[in-house]
């Protein structure tokens, strides 16, 4: 199960698979793929052995690399060659070198990063400022009020909504729901989460059943089902280092000491 996430540029040198999205769409994998930003959890099946190497693309990176609307192209697994020049060639070259043992996974990742960096074309300055404002707004709490965002931007409410959909894939209200659920799942999966922090997380939802529904919608699992052996990959995906685009959203005195810190935003 793949939780709702930011976009990815991913190489699959070994194995093939398919992703099934909530809209009933099923996309088969390719050697080099664009996994577009997703608005809810999606299931996947693979014929292994299956290896995946790639880049997570923050909203600014997604826009700069692809130029695609994160909303119009959400919830898809697309061949990168349909959108990126030279993708088919570099995908085939890296996959062959990896299968032959001539390049490591880390080296593949660096090669993909260099390929992507050469093709980046950032949006205009005001749009970049809005992306930064939305990101910081999400980090102010687990479920920040939308009115707070509207007061931060230099755009009208409708323009802010439209640009948020373009770069983040969802309107502000839905985006806040997504990151509340993802961060709640990440924090509740932490073995040494303080009781006060757990209570604070619960208070950001209407009640326990609402929290369970929201976490299931965006991660594909309920909080009680993160402990099974079949969820090892899911738990890794929901690790703090893989939710780097926003701060944790907890008050400083409730932050757990296991790396789930709220002391700043990681960039990539």
Language model features with spans:
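Alpha-helical bundle regulatory/interaction domains
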Residues: 1-147, 152-157, 170-171, 188-189, ...
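CoA-thioester-processing core
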Residues: 175-178
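HTH DNA-binding helix-turn interface
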Residues: 163-172, 215-223
